[in-house]
Amino acid sequence: IIKGTAVTTKFSLVGDDVHGSSGHVSYSTWIANATITVKSGSKASDVIVKAFKQYGYSIIGSTSYISGVTTPSGVSLKAFDNGSGSGWMYAVNGKSPNVGISGYKVSKDDNIILYYVDDWSNAKVPTVEDPADNQKAADAVIKKISEIGEVTESSENLIKEARASYDALTD
C-alpha cells in the first residue's frame, strides 16, 4: 500500500541471450508493460526495483548503474557479455533521458523500458508489444473467419477481409 500521492507507470524489460560478440538473433521481452505504482517523487530505479521484486528478477550492480540482470531461473545477463559495447540501457516514453536511471523522476503514465543492447553506440529503443493487444488482434481475425459461414461466391469479400486481417498479424 502506497501512502500519499501515487504514480502509476508501465515497465518493460527486454533482454537477450548470452552469445558473445557474435551470434545475435533477436532480443526478447522478459516483462511486458507491467503496471507499477510508486509514490510521488520516485525515480525510474524505484520502478525497476519494484518490478523486479514483483517478477522475481534481481539487479547486479546498483540502482544507479545496473551492470546486470538475473532472471527468476538464475540466468544472468551482464554488461560486456555480448561484446565490449553491450550492456543495459533505459528509456522513458520511447526516448533515452539525459540523466541516470536513479536521477529520473517518474511521472504518471511514464512507460519505462530497461533493455539490453549489444552495442550502446548503435542502440535503438525497442518496441514492446503487449500480449493482450496480440490476443485482441487474433480474436478479431477469428471473428471475421467465423462470420464467413458457408463458403460461396458471395462470401468472397468476407474471405478477403479475413485474409487481410490474418496477414496483418504476421507483419
Residue ranges and their predicted role:
Residues 1-133:
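Ubiquitin-like/PB1-type beta-grasp interaction modules and other compact soluble beta-rich domains
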